[in-house]
Amino acid sequence: MYQHHNWQGALLDYPVSKVVCVGSNYAKHIKEMGSAVPEEPVLFIKPETALCDLRQPLAIPSDFGSVHHEVELAVLIGATLRQATEEHVRKAIAGYGVALDLTLRDVQGKMKKAGQPWEKAKAFDNSCPLSGFIPAAEFTGDPQNTTLSLSVNGEQRQQGTTADMIHKIVPLIAYMSKFFTLKAGDVVLTGTPDGVGPLQSGDELTVTFDGHSLTTRVL
């Protein structure tokens, strides 16, 4: 069972709960998906059962078509946020990590075409592999100007920087809190840069953010 932990692997005293995500938050990714830039952030939720440890081998579905990787900056919430100001958001951020928003792309395409919600494509079991978190007070970089990259079998597929986000981290979380109360232990995913693509059994992935790297593989 997944538990929040720091980058070194020590358990953190936060409950595991929901993941609130934003789609279409990088212009180049929007272009590669053939989508239009939304007027407001596109939000969706992954349940607790979507979370798994990025350090462990990834179990992906085999019965629903292609499974795509999307590397994202993850934000750990450390206090309740409801109708929050940006000042409250800054104080409530407990840490930063990196996550994969695994996506059943064929399923998502059908649901988009039918005008239906994305949950089946985005919120399935183990769809959110998550790293350990670096405490906000110890994060030496700028979370809003942090590099993100993902390589598969030594080939770089995704490379971006959080500086390119359309909706920046703090105002984005404040916006989320207008609709969903965020509690300590909740995680926010902030969108993916371009270069998303399919995963296959046996693939080895290296995920990097702000100079920190993790390697995992697909079962």
From Swiss-Prot:
GO molecular function terms noted in the UniProt entry: acetylpyruvate hydrolase activity; metal ion binding; oxaloacetate tautomerase activity
InterPro entries hit by this protein: Fumarylacetoacetase-like_C, Fumarylacetoacetase_C_sf
Example GO biological process: oxaloacetate metabolic process
Keywords: Isomerase, Metal-binding
Residues noted as binding Mg(2+) in the record, renumbered to the chain: 70, 72, 101
Knocked-out gene: effects: Metabolic defects, characterized by a significant increase in acetate and other metabolites associated with anaerobic respiration.
EC code(s) of this entry: 5.3.2.2
Similarity-based family: Belongs to the FAH family.
Protein name: Oxaloacetate tautomerase YcgM
Source species: Escherichia coli (strain K12)
Lineage of the species this protein comes from: Bacteria, Pseudomonadati, Pseudomonadota, Gammaproteobacteria, Enterobacterales
